[in-house]
Curated annotation (Swiss-Prot):
Ubl conjugation is among the record's keywords: no
Recorded family membership: Belongs to the small GTPase superfamily. Ras family.
Residues involved in GTP binding: 24-29, 40-46, 127-130
Primary location recorded for the protein, binned into one broad class: membrane
PTM sites of type Phosphoserine: 194
Activity control mechanisms: Alternates between an inactive form bound to GDP and an active form bound to GTP. Activated by a guanine nucleotide-exchange factor (GEF) and inactivated by a GTPase-activating protein (GAP).
Entry PTM: Phosphorylated. Phosphorylation at Ser-194 by AURKA/Aurora kinase A, during mitosis, induces RALA localization to the mitochondrion where it regulates mitochondrial fission. Prenylation is essential for membrane localization. The geranylgeranylated form and the farnesylated mutant do not undergo alternative prenylation in response to geranylgeranyltransferase I inhibitors (GGTIs) and farnesyltransferase I inhibitors (FTIs).
Organism from which the protein derives: Homo sapiens (Human)
Mutagenesis or variant effect for residue 130 to G: In HINCONS; decreased GTPase activity; decreased RALA effector binding
Lipidation (S-geranylgeranyl cysteine): 203
Protein name (Swiss-Prot/TrEMBL): Ras-related protein Ral-A
Catalysis: reaction(s): GTP + H2O = GDP + phosphate + H(+)
Gene behind the chain: RALA
Amino acid sequence: MAANKPKGQNSLALHKVIMVGSGGVGKSALTLQFMYDEFVEDYEPTKADSYRKKVVLDGEEVQIDILDTAGQEDYAAIRDNYFRSGEGFLCVFSITEMESFAATADFREQILRVKEDENVPFLLVGNKSDLEDKRQVSVEEAKNRAEQWNVNYVETSAKTRANVDKVFFDLMREIRARKMEDSKEKNGKKKRKSLAKRIRERCCIL
């Protein structure tokens, strides 16, 4: 008798995460720290880099697909295509750079415009928390913005790995919850459709 085949990667739940934020805030450093446990300080910006990894989320083996987008304005026009494919977003700024914090509003607006959904899974991330002495964006200021958007705010350090796993896992939980919600809604619509069809059929018989 043939042994049971191990669960294939294709059958694992896949959660698609998009990294957004200005250039130089540490999006790639966060991604590479999460993927490979490495801190990369100097990273050449590209249009986008994609990464995939198997992880255990609350006891369930899943896959995370991370698309690390470039923050430079040159690439603004092609971001829409990336945003359409995403299921959740980590919007990153540097706590040492007020300008990058201000830019998060533009990224949020662009995401909402493309996704047409105010409740899209989304986390506001203040990176470079190890550089407290150079802080320009207060925790209170960032938390206030997160509250306005009805999202969570987390501070990270790609250098020390502080909260790196947390932001990716928290976002995956949001994505998973959203998928379950959408699935219930879809099933509810199917049931209502089926019930309406049965009622119509009964009326025809009568």
